[in-house]
Amino acid sequence: MTKKQELAIVGGGIGGLTAALALQRAGLAVRVFEQAPELAEVGAGISLSPTAVHGLNHLGLRDVLQREAYAPEDQVVRHYQDARPLSDINRGQSLIKQYGERYYLIHRADLHDALAAAVRANDPAAIVLDHRLVSLKQQGDRVHLTFSNGKQYEVDAAVGADGSRSVVREQLFGPGDPQFTGYIAWRGLVPMAKVPPGVLNPPSGIFVG
């Protein structure tokens, strides 16, 4: 019997877990190494384009999106200072006709939880917590990983999904700080009672300025 290829994914965020689920479905043995002592996701809502929705559907998350996400029919672009409408975007039937799927809004934590549950359903031991990568080396046809807790692993391949200050990237290409692009996005959660009347009609909007 041919042994399954073993892959390590460094980073247990949305990107790392999505990669893990896809590789599991391809028949590979996957370990996700997350530096935090428990799996959690911070942030607010994120948008899922029809292309992303197709990908998540392929990974078996269609029911999760239909249950946890919101699919707006329309979206209004508003000025960030006074919320006046600037333009309208149809997010419903026009996207279905063009791309075959809807546009969804979902809380990051809900998507993250669903991905983690799906990965663990395939292999309860797939996600390894409290493992912060300190070094990664190619040794022959294997990749050797060393973690801050002293543990070491050898795998056939490794995927770096450890964020903007990636240890994997630094090991491969040397040190380098993230470069500011000039764009800023403000994210947060506001109680519905404090939202001015009319701002959430339709209930999906983008504030720019």
Residue positions per predicted region:
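Beta1/beta-strand and adjacent pyrophosphate-binding region of the FAD-binding site
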Residues: 2-15
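Structural signature of beta-strand start/N-cap positions in the alpha/beta core
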Residues: 6, 29-31, 151
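A short, Lys/Arg-enriched amphipathic alpha-helix followed by its capping loop at the start of a domain
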Residues: 19-28, 55-58
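Active-site-adjacent segment of FAD-dependent monooxygenases/related oxidoreductases
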Residues: 44, 48-118
